[in-house]
Amino acid sequence: MLRFQRFASSYAQAQAVRKYPVGGIFHGYEVRRILPVPELRLTAVDLVHSQTGAEHLHIDRDDKNNVFSIAFKTNPPDSTGVPHILEHTTLCGSVKYPVRDPFFKMLNKSLANFMNAMTGPDYTFFPFSTTNPQDFANLRGVYLDSTLNPLLKQEDFDQEGWRLEHKNITDPESNIVFKGVVYNEMKGQISNANYYFWSKFQQSIYPSLNNSGGDPMKITDLRYGDLLDFHHKNYHPSNAKTFTYGNLPLVDTLKQLNEQFSGYGKRARKDKLLMPIDLKKDIDVKLLGQIDTMLPPEKQTKASMTWICGAPQDTYDTFLLKVLGNLLMDGHSSVMYQKLIESGIGLEFSVNSGVEPTTAVNLLTVGIQGVSDIEIFKDTVNNIFQNLLETEHPFDRKRIDAIIEQLELSKKDQKADFGLQLLYSILPGWTNKIDPFESLLFEDVLQRFRGDLETKGDTLFQDLIRKYIVHKPCFTFSIQGSEEFSKSLDDEEQTRLREKITALDEQDKKNIFKRGILLQEKQNEKEDLSCLPTLQIKDIPRAGDKYSIEQKNNTMSRITDTNGITYVRGKRLLNDIIPFELFPYLPLFAESLTNLGTTTESFSEIEDQIKLHTGGISTHVEVTSDPNTTEPRLIFGFDGWSLNSKTDHIFEFWSKILLETDFHKNSDKLKVLIRLLASSNTSSVADAGHAFARGYSAAHYRSSGAINETLNGIEQLQFINRLHSLLDNEETFQREVVDKLTELQKYIVDTNNMNFFITSDSDVQAKTVESQISKFMERLPHGSCLPNGPKTSDYPLIGSKCKHTLIKFPFQVHYTSQALLGVPYTHKDGSALQVMSNMLTFKHLHREVREKGGAYGGGASYSALAGIFSFYSYRDPQPLKSLETFKNSGRYILNDAKWGVTDLDEAKLTIFQQVDAPKSPKGEGVTYFMSGVTDDMKQARREQLLDVSLLDVHRVAEKYLLNKEGVSTVIGPGIEGKTVSPNWEVKEL
């Protein structure tokens, strides 16, 4: 156990210590302990509510982005998803706020930059963050009443959980089907092969924990009464852990908590510490799962090996295990990467790989996907661990030093959402009786580690391997992709549905029809929202933040508090330089620079040096749009950051990867990279299918959208898939891949049109970096590759005979988009289009697509820079109905919507949540550098947004939406008899 002997190192921390003396009583709360943490510039205060036993953790820090959360321990009793469905229904109305979904309604009555509710494996929590004190008080009140006093109506359970309902609600002769937001959400989740693997792994090794999100096969067993019982048992102050962070007075929160908890007593809880399987001998579990259509048949298996390694309550041992996991599996020089991935045994690490502290035990897992022979995989892993024990110095000391350096740097790197990240790191352990102060004692753990490393060296890790892994029982888990799996899920659902329907009598069926009609009527009701607290437009400052930037030649500098760190960004404008046929190779080129190696060094050697001396080096390619014209700006970017004293290393590494990356010598590494990219294609679509659909639709309108589709969309996935098919033909691979990347290197690496952005904490440091930039540019070619190529603005749009495309994926649900043409960033109509998109989302599409249609999410968005108006739906069981809703939105606004000034103001509040969201120091001024959007442009747009009227909304609805068909894209399974030519183009991947 680490000792909590700390001393305040600053005036602010000393003040906090005096403000909250140990033993002090504040509104029924007693201060139990206080902990200054100077290295994080914070003071932690641990309090307990005397009447109920509720625990509160306050993090006092000079940060205006304040955070509140209330969390409950919620062990799932089964896999019906009751914790998850309760999380949803809790936010569907409460005693004080008896409106449908006050949580969603508060999204446009607030300036919160984050609002959410989340279900963990054995806990549920409700966090938000905002910079506005009144907003903080408003949301805190809504969150507390929603969680402690929810209405939990039957119709909310039906809507958010699951229900039997006619496919066509108004037609009693139409088929009865399963509906429900969570039901469809989880159907979408199991379409993601990575999620399915992780979920089944957790259920196999930790069956007592059940599936808190819900297994669709089990969700339909949940009854309304079970939901009420689960809330009564778990959503009680005695089971609550509340959290605050920031610079607002703690006493205001304690006062409100005490008032909310006043009607409750102390309730004894005997939560059983849920344990995993009893791993006394080796266990091997094999299952079938989703096939990945982008991988060959022999690469359809995911497999992992897991060992139980002590308990997370031993925080130091857990820290050592995490370092060991990092040494084993993180980066190109890690032994598991070299022996498992580079060797070709697998394509990439599986989603469960690494060290995971669970409820009661730590799990260390080594897993890969795309494995052809599981026995070879197991033998290789076992041999690696055995060799690590038999080698005198198995780990390069530089790698360990690099890990320490990364930990130190991460502590100094200031993030805008620091409070939320702190909550996420503390809460899982805190709900399982791990002292939250232990999680904050970063420096103490690091000092102990340094000392042990000096005295014990590598035996520190060898002892862990000997204690927990070698000759210890192992849990092996694998899932083989099956072409029949998707059909088996459909068949199971139909069988389950038939069983439910068979059990119904005629009266039950009449009740189902009536209930569907009543639910729709409820959803259509105009509600009185006056009970909800709200901010006003006057709470939004008319003038936005401006960042002072100094420009000298090709370099911009921003001086701000960076905590001793310097961030450097470089970019080269590639317009009119690259031949169109090389555009698809650009993302692979950027990835290759930080994966392959040079003529003289492997990337594993380079990577270790990067981690030892910097916070990281990255390269990327992106396309933005000119704010005045929407013309494309194709950019190659390269970034790096380090301590002020080490910025010379950034330029050293940039020079190395830009000038010396050798595609020919490292072609084997290039093949590994292509395999890795191909293996993650399908899961990336399952995670963000609506974004892929939106991008594909937008690519029909502007060259910037078409380029973005080539670089980041479905077309890029197809391209990587094609390259993957060339790997076994060496001659073709050299010609079609290696030679093309080498050619790109000549086009890209040149100082022409190259610019830089420095973020640091002093003019002296900025001048030092400017000098380093000059020396760096002297090493690069100049003028060898000028804009003499095809005009980037002429890049071809996606040509299609019809305006509807189905892109087939083996999912259980769909993702949809419909796109229409908008205007450039500086055009005044852009602000009205953005406000209209928000009003459609909150006042129309949420009800139609989610509440009625059963999709997990849906709405409208406007990309101000790209000038594209988009509709979308996410995990949608009724994609064609959603598309019809999108198509009729213009008519709805002009004929049916009864929007008033309040609706307009709420839309503006929602928009400014992101416009005025806090930025980290490294993000200040970067929009101007990357996109050319000046402070004056942002201010003009800000004023336009604030001044948008209802007449403006109606005008742009008529001009840009009414009678406009748009371009539609659906991603997911085929829809029998509906998505056929000539009206639809169907793409098979």
Curated annotation (Swiss-Prot):
Q: Does the keyword Nuclease apply?
A: no
Which Pfam families does this one have? M16C_assoc, Peptidase_M16, Peptidase_M16_C, PreP_C
Q: Which GO terms describe its cellular component?
A: mitochondrial intermembrane space; mitochondrial matrix; mitochondrion
Q: Known SMART domains for this protein?
A: M16C_associated
What is the activity-regulation note?
Activated by nucleotides, including ATP, GTP, CTP, UTP, and ADP. Activated by copper, manganese, calcium and magnesium ions; copper and manganese restore activity following inactivation by EDTA (ethylenediaminetetraacetic acid). Inhibited by metal chelators including EDTA, EGTA (ethylene glycol bis(2-aminoethyl)tetraacetic acid), and 1,10-phenanthroline. Inhibited by copper, zinc, and iron ions. Also inhibited by dithiothreitol p-mercuribenzenesulfonic acid, N-ethylmaleimide, protoporphyrin, hemin, protamine and triarginine.
Entry binding sites for ATP? 972-979
What InterPro entries would the database entry show?
A: Metalloenz_LuxS/M16, Pept_M16_N, Peptidase_M16_C, Peptidase_M16C_assoc, PreP_C
**Catalytic residues, chain numbering:** 87 (proton acceptor), 160
**One function term, GO molecular function aspect:** zinc ion binding
The cofactor required is: Zn(2+)
| Effect of a null allele | Decreases processing of mitochondrial precursor proteins. Impairs mitochondrial function; increases levels of reactive oxygen species (ROS) in cells, impairs oxygen consumption and decreases the membrane potential. Simultaneous disruption of the mitochondrial-processing peptidase subunit MAS1 or the mitochondrial peptidase OCT1 results in synthetic lethality in respiratory conditions. Decreases processing and activity of SOD2.
Q: Which family does it belong to?
A: Belongs to the peptidase M16 family. PreP subfamily.
Its subunit composition reads:
Monomer and homodimer; homodimerization is induced by binding of the substrate.
The name this protein goes by in its record: Presequence protease, mitochondrial
Q: Which organism is it from?
A: Saccharomyces cerevisiae (strain ATCC 204508 / S288c) (Baker's yeast)
Gene symbol of the encoding locus? CYM1
